[in-house]
Amino acid sequence: MNNIIKMLNDEQMKTDVPDFGAGDTVVVQVRVKEGEKERLQAFEGLVIAKRNRGLHSAFTVRKISNGEGVERAFQTHSPLIASIEVKRRGRVRRAKLYYLRERSGKSARIREKLGTK
């Protein structure tokens, strides 16, 4: 039984997901269906949390829109996600950046990770 579930999960997992983590700035292209038409909507922001659970992996992206903080949670392997592009790597010392919710301006900045390790 477990082998069947594992096989189905592996079949549905995407292979083109880039390597990213908390602190990275990403652009997520989401498929949006409006009536009969379908279009791509870009959501660019900072990854504040990532949850790695195989097919059930998810991540949360936060951006500031018109002075208001907007967070959106995405399922990593969802068919509604067209692509994920990493714009900038951030250097952080925490796995979850929920403390950024209370901060604004210069105190909410994330240092950029330079070079590759």
UniProtKB/Swiss-Prot annotation:
The organism's place on the tree of life at top rank: Bacteria
GO molecular function, one term: structural constituent of ribosome
InterPro entries, alphabetized: Ribosomal_bL19, Ribosomal_bL19_CS, Ribosomal_bL19_sf, Translation_prot_SH3-like_sf
Gene3D superfamilies in UniProt: 2.30.30.790
GO cellular component: cytosolic large ribosomal subunit
Swiss-Prot/TrEMBL keywords: Ribonucleoprotein, Ribosomal protein
Annotated S-S bridges: none
GO BP field: translation
Family as reported in the entry's similarity comment: Belongs to the bacterial ribosomal protein bL19 family.
Record function comment: This protein is located at the 30S-50S ribosomal subunit interface and may play a role in the structure and function of the aminoacyl-tRNA binding site.
The protein's name: Large ribosomal subunit protein bL19
Gene field: rplS
